[in-house]
């Protein structure tokens, strides 16, 4: 598997931890077993040119920080661990957990086009998903939506059924019913 489309990013190495080669990983996954269950994972270099197989020995969650501390069999000391800063931890996309109806993988939502359900107007494109009390879709607004320069404007849209009633992965679109003023808050 060397195609970037065949991988799922589960986290990014942000630092070495301790002297025995442990790594701090900022999670981009909602599935703790990806960091806690031993087995094969893959590392992608920051330049995205190389992917190497590694063996996860153990991992533990650091409460309140969205971080895991992991140990890879191939990394013996802090010096080796420090060379992996900004590497990405991957799993094959075939390892995606099955989701219930109404649940989505974040990677499936990125780059979907967002439309106003009542007017049909194209609003923008999903650029990220942020976790807060509710998940929030980060949407880059279209420049065509107003006379203002909105080329860099982004809005956060609560990812709840009342506001986002339609997610159509097949047609790569999301329809929203934003409350008055939501799109002007950026």
Swiss-Prot record:
Signal peptide, first to last residue: none
Subcellular locations according to the entry: Cytoplasm
Main location: cytoplasm
Annotated ranges, domain PRC barrel: 100-182
Gene Ontology cellular component list: cytoplasm; ribosome
This protein's UniProt keywords: Chaperone, Cytoplasm, Ribosome biogenesis, rRNA processing
An example Gene Ontology molecular-function term: ribosome binding
GO biological process: ribosomal small subunit biogenesis; rRNA processing
The UniProt record lists the keyword Transferase: no
Domains: entry comment: The PRC barrel domain binds ribosomal protein uS19.
Subunit field text: Binds ribosomal protein uS19.
Family according to the record: Belongs to the RimM family.
Protein's job: An accessory protein needed during the final step in the assembly of 30S ribosomal subunit, possibly for assembly of the head region. Essential for efficient processing of 16S rRNA. May be needed both before and after RbfA during the maturation of 16S rRNA. It has affinity for free ribosomal 30S subunits but not for 70S ribosomes.
Protein name as it appears in the record: Ribosome maturation factor RimM
Species per Swiss-Prot/TrEMBL record: Rippkaea orientalis (strain PCC 8801 / RF-1) (Cyanothece sp. (strain PCC 8801))
């Amino acid at each position: 598997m060397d195609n970037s489309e065949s991988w799922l990013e589960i986290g990014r190495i942000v630092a070495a931890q301790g002297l025995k080669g442990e790594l701090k990983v900022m999670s981009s996954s909602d599935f703790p077993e990806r960091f806690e269950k031993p087995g094969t994972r893959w590392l992608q270099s920051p330049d995205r040119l190389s992917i190497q197989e590694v063996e996860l020995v153990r991992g533990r969650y650091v409460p309140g920080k969205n971080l895991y501390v992991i140990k890879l069999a191939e990394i013996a000391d802090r010096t080796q661990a420090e060379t992996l800063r900004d590497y990405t931890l991957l799993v094959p996309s075939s390892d995606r957990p099955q989701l219930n109806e109404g649940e989505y993988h974040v990677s499936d939502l990125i780059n979907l086009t967002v439309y106003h359900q009542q007017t049909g107007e194209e609003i923008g494109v999903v650029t990220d998903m942020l976790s807060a009390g509710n998940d929030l879709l980060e949407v880059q607004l279209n420049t065509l939506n107003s006379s203002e320069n909105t080329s860099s404007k982004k809005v956060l849209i609560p990812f709840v059924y009342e506001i986002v009633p339609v997610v159509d992965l097949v047609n790569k679109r999301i329809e929203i019913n934003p409350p008055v003023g939501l799109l002007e808050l950026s």
